[in-house]
Amino acid sequence: WTFMDGLHQNIKSYTHSGSKPCKMAATGEAPIGISFAYRGAKEKAAGAPLELIFPSEGLGWEMEAAGILKGTKQLAAAQTLMDWAASEKANQLYNEGYAIVAMPGIAKPVAHFPAEPEKLLIKNDFDWAAQNRDSILTEWQKRYEGKAEAK
């Protein structure tokens, strides 16, 4: 929490959108926006006057997932959707919004984004994050909620 306490002193407001801080910096509404790296690269490629800084500690990331609910009444349709979601075509479409996709060899380089981004990812422990989610959110709200934008 030490890092966040220091950062908090320099935060005007916390948004509920991961890309909004970058968009605000791109339009001049804010001098700095802490955001998804991919959004920053896209804004800069579109001409925004941004200087992108990637943390030397590594890039944060999250995992997208899809699945079929046990007992679904439309199993064949659900399986068709999941087959498509794991297809080469779907991975090509994912690359329009993500620098890294699941299928090797599909992702194209993104302008203004680090080369070989997979090597820059921090280690994520999803089990730990899930087990500690409630306590982390409670502590975050106690410390920082006062600067969060309204939902």
Q: Where is each model-derived feature located?
A:
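A bilobed periplasmic-binding-protein/Venus flytrap-type ligand-binding module shared by bacterial periplasmic
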Residues: 62-74, 93-94
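Conserved C-terminal helix/tail region of periplasmic/extracytoplasmic solute-binding proteins
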Residues: 123-151
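Periplasmic-binding protein-like
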Residues: 84-107
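Solvent-exposed, polar/charged alpha-helical surfaces in well-ordered, non-transmembrane soluble domains
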Residues: 2-5, 23, 27, 79-83, ...
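Ligand-binding pocket segment of bilobal, Venus flytrap-like solute-binding proteins
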Residues: 1-57
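Short helix/strand-capping connector loops at secondary-structure junctions
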Residues: 111-125
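Solvent-exposed loop/turn segments at secondary-structure junctions
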Residues: 38-41, 57-60, 73, 87-88
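Soluble non-cytosolic domains of exported or imported proteins
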Residues: 16-19, 72-76, 88, 127-134
